[in-house]
Amino acid sequence: VGSEMCIRDRYIKMALEEDINSEDISTNAVMPEYKKGEVTLLAKQDGIIAGLQVFKRVFTILDPNTEVIFAEKDGNQIKDGDAVTNGQVLATVVGDIRVLLSGERTALNYLQRMSGIATYTNNVAALLKGTNTKLLDTRKTTPCMRIFEKYAVRAGGGNNHRYNLSDAVMLKDNHIDAAGGVAKAIQMAREYASFVCKIEVETENLDMVREAVEAGADIIMLDNMSPELMAEAIKIIDGRAKTECSGNITKENIETITKLGVDYVSSGALTHSAPILDISLKHLHPID
């Protein structure tokens, strides 16, 4: 947790430096001196909220004295993973008006992006409810946003696949081509990686599936296969490896796919295609 917070803070500071640069000219022009103020955080769309602590951290990095007071819902303070509705007050931010103005865009960028991913993930996860199939994300994330985007997937009810390349072995088409075949790639991975390291292999046809099973792959990804081809592949695997389907996954065919008994469904769309959730800071005013 400590290292995650350090990584998070490093990226937030980079984002603030990117946006503010040497100074916030507009704010310094209209607010040359300290004045205490408050502003209201409002949801402008129904969805799942995620990134509240990141939103808060943007302001406290700029000024540790900034207060972010999260609203209550049903007697409990609002938290990541909660459903929010259009017009709902999410928080009040109190502090130096210059900080509220300069941090606004960066704080909202994180909160809108993360809440959009959580909302999109939640909608897809609802289609898997009642099944044993787990929904996974991918590494198709925005550079320097992975820690935030993968967190948002979890907040929306999904699960994280590999966080980075050192987490597990995944042999994709180019790895297999470079090694000289499925069996050879698996053999080389077994010899190189720790014995506790899972080996996943991406397959595109039934011959590759057979080769991966016989070579002892732990997880076999069925990439861009039709439901009919997946059914054949699952018969071949016959429980000897975990199964993951990826590519060509739509709301229309996901129910058919889960009925095949696949263990995992992975979708890059959770992070690369989720629209933002509309959230804004409104009604900024000075207070005594």
Label for each model-derived stretch:
Residues 241:
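A short helix->loop->beta-strand "cap" motif at the edges of active sites that frequently abuts
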Residues 224, 253:
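C-terminal active-site rim and adjoining tail of enzyme catalytic domains
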Residues 269-288:
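Short, charged, intrinsically disordered terminal tails
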Residues 3, 8-215, 219, 228-236, ...:
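Acidic/glycine-rich phosphate/pyrophosphate-binding loops and surrounding catalytic core
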Residues 250:
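Glycine/proline-rich, positively charged
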